[in-house]
Amino acid sequence: KTKLGTQDYDLYKRVVDPVREQTDLILSLTTSGIAGRNLPHEVRLIPLAFKPELASFDAGSINLGGDVFSNPPDFLDVAAAKMIQSGVKPEIEVFDLGMAVTALNMNKRGQLESPMYFQFVMGTPWGAPGTPKALLHLLEHIPEESAWSVIGIGQSHLPMSLMALIMGGHIRVGME
């Protein structure tokens, strides 16, 4: 109705239940909320009630268009604990090196479990460029046993996807 993203439980249920009944797809649901709206933690974490295999874990705040996509440390702490409690694997979304470092520090403190799964978001105007050099730089900083995938934004989609496949990573497709 509003054409905005939502964390509405009933709307998620209308989508998740038929997908679960009719397929064996791996579900990755978002805890990202909506940039600029600063939803309460409990609202952002509603999708974890559906026990998806993966859920987004944006490892820091970032400018997003004309708004700030806010992921302060207190939210990251709550989200990480809830994901462990729910048995949901965090899809650690990394828009820049600082987010990877945040996730690594949380792993050292036991807040994120190993092996970690990193999703490198490349080519946004406010984050890491969608270049082979930028991807290699990010990969140098994560543990070798980590799984990782790439999403290239705009023009970087195809080159980043091909690079990930060549290097043994994964690519992200689908809707958000």
Residues covered by each model-derived region:
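Short beta-strand segments at enzyme active-site cores
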Residues: 1, 27-31, 92-93, 173
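Histidine-centered divalent-metal-coordination microenvironment in nucleic-acid enzymes
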Residues: 1-2, 30, 103, 164
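Alpha-helix-loop-beta-strand connector modules within alpha/beta enzyme cores
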Residues: 3-31, 78-85, 137-145
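Short Asp/Glu-rich motifs
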Residues: 3-6, 38-39, 102
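Short, electropositive alpha-helical surface patch
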Residues: 6-23, 43-54, 105-118, 172
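Short, glycine/charge-rich beta-strand/loop segments that flank catalytic centers
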Residues: 29-38, 96-99
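Short, acidic/polar
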Residues: 38-48, 157-161
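Catalytic alpha/beta core domains of metabolic enzymes, predominantly
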Residues: 54-175
